[in-house]
Amino acid sequence: QLSKKIMRHCSNGLTHIIILWIISKEKIHGYGIMKKLDEFFSSCNPTEYNKTNSSKIYPILRKLEKTGIIKGEWGVSNNKSVKYYSLTEEGEILLKSFKSEFAHLINSPLWLSFIEDMSDNEMHKVENDEKCN
């Protein structure tokens, strides 16, 4: 179905940003990131969501690490050697830039109208009414 393909494309685009956000909150290993992503996306659409798998996440983590956005350090969890990820300074700058862009989007009347229409939700109607007066 076209709608499923479009939704998958949208979630794939957000996955990198969400991974950075998750890592910004705590040093976390790949499996922990997968669990957080499952929690994040399943709350959006539990009946349509397929669990995150390692074949999707670890290539993203390797790419982010290779480009210097995150760094991995080996540690032990449950008697297993695991790699814990954290943001580098470059990663923190990138995430801050994403936050700034996101703040700009959600404060844009056109984007806000789009989000409200697509979600049947009046997210900031009171705030927007106050800004207009």
Regions of interest found by a model, annotated:
Residues 1-13, 98-108:
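Intrinsically disordered, low-complexity serine/threonine- and proline-rich regulatory segments
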Residues 8-9, 61, 116-120:
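Short, contiguous hydrophobic alpha-helices characteristic of membrane insertion segments
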Residues 8-56:
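N-terminal helix-turn-helix DNA-binding core of bacterial DNA-binding proteins
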Residues 65-81, 86:
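Beta-hairpin "wing" of winged helix-turn-helix
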Residues 81-99:
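Basic, amphipathic "hinge/linker" alpha-helix immediately C-terminal to the N-terminal HTH DNA-binding motif
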Residues 93-133:
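Amphipathic alpha-helical dimerization/coiled-coil segments
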